[in-house]
Curated annotation (Swiss-Prot):
CDD domains: SIS_PGI_1 (cd05015), SIS_PGI_2 (cd05016). It catalyses: alpha-D-glucose 6-phosphate = beta-D-fructose 6-phosphate. Keywords: Cytoplasm, Gluconeogenesis, Glycolysis, Isomerase. This is Glucose-6-phosphate isomerase. Belongs to the GPI family. It comes from Stenotrophomonas maltophilia (strain K279a). It is an enzyme of class 5 (isomerase). PROSITE patterns: P_GLUCOSE_ISOMERASE_1 (PS00765), P_GLUCOSE_ISOMERASE_2 (PS00174), P_GLUCOSE_ISOMERASE_3 (PS51463). One of its GO terms (cellular component) is cytosol. Pathway: Carbohydrate biosynthesis; gluconeogenesis; Carbohydrate degradation; glycolysis; D-glyceraldehyde 3-phosphate and glycerone phosphate from D-glucose: step 2/4.
Amino acid sequence: MTTNNGFDSLHSHAQRLKGASIPGLLAAEPGRVQDLALRVGPLYVNFARQKYDAAALQALLALAADRDVGGAITRLFRGEQVNLTEGRAALHTALRGDVVDAPVAAEAYATAREIRQRMGVLVRALEDSGVTDVVSVGIGGSDLGPRLVADALRPVSGARLRVHFVSNVDGAAMQRTLATLDPAKTAGILISKTFGTQETLLNGQILHDWLGGSDRLYAVSANPERAAKAFAIAADRVLPMWDWVGGRYSLWSAVGFPIALAIGFERFEQLLEGAAQMDAHALDAPLERNLPVLHGLTDIWNRNLLGHATHAVMTYDQRLALLPAYLQQLVMESLGKRVQRDGQPVTTDTVPVWWGGAGTDVQHSFFQALHQGTSIVPADFIGCVHNDDPYTINHQALLANLLAQTEALANGQGSDDPHRDYPGGRPSTLILLDALTPQALGALIAMYEHAVYVQSVIWNINAFDQFGVELGKQLASGLLPALQGEDVAVADPMTREILAQLKG
């Protein structure tokens, strides 16, 4: 479904390239590998194995110019009201740097810096308190980002604090976490933007009771009064966040409190520095050399012009194993929309399904389908040039597999035996971090954030609301009393029957 006139010339390019092979594109454009490579700080990204040529890329860039992608990026940074449905700015960039001369953004940056200083005081106090473990309770944006960064960057040994994450309302998750801990040496953090999230409130109550009160409870919320009241948490242990920061963009805020506890406050600030470096690039680089713009346009090409319905992310670094889950929320919650900013139906398909895993494990699970299945799945392959562990041969083998898989997916290999024939033609983007440092991870995450925004501008949708998550939560709230024995009228016949089965 791509009927928008802005895509007309792109359709002709897609048709022209229908029979092209990726090796053929590389041969036809001798400088392609260098021309389609960009470096931004610690990140190197190469698009040469995508299935477009220079002419098609110019048409994509013309579409971006026509949709005023550059102006939209500036409006985002300046703190203009880009979240129209909720009447808000989206100033997550101001959490990590002061890169634009605009009063709203400058005020947000100053506010965020002040709260970050408060957070640093709390981090150091906890490090010196005798507490050994911290349980962080949150879900969605209050969990996925902090969990990813803490897992990726936590030291192998010598950490002052061990941080554990609980998100699911399933009591088994909390039970398994608490079973390994000593309540006398444990603190808890409750993270919720509204402090009305069912999962966080229920898990928070379990944690509060297990700790024997609120003396070692902390909270992060855009509703600090409600947070303090719900669990009697002292005001000096409640850190604010703001309605101009969406949950899935909030790890840079006080939502990153558990990150700072897990990796140290200085390294948390280095994470922000890496993101700010990518912000400056996204804001200042011309479209044709703008990494997030090119990444976003590549995703537009694969979705709308080539018709690919899913996108895979393979992290050839075990420490980034949680990145695909994080990106699922970032991309699919931001871009999973069926109406434009003015409420009219979209005229193109929007977000594909994002999924993935860590290499080389994934080679022994779903790579069979990637190589020989009937659906072509564009992919991002992410690796690190340098490793931090002492097992050099293992790291060399890991990188050899990364390179081999991208080559095999793109080039394929013919065979007289159809069962052993590899068709190739599977596009991928290669992303290399110099090493898995806080700066590099910050830059990587910020790149994806901006690429998502670029796509939202092209599709004319709002990347910063998420009304699609509300209906199921509302229905669950109405059904909970029925499972607790109350007589509740249930209109849906299937739900009514299953409730009867559940209640015996």
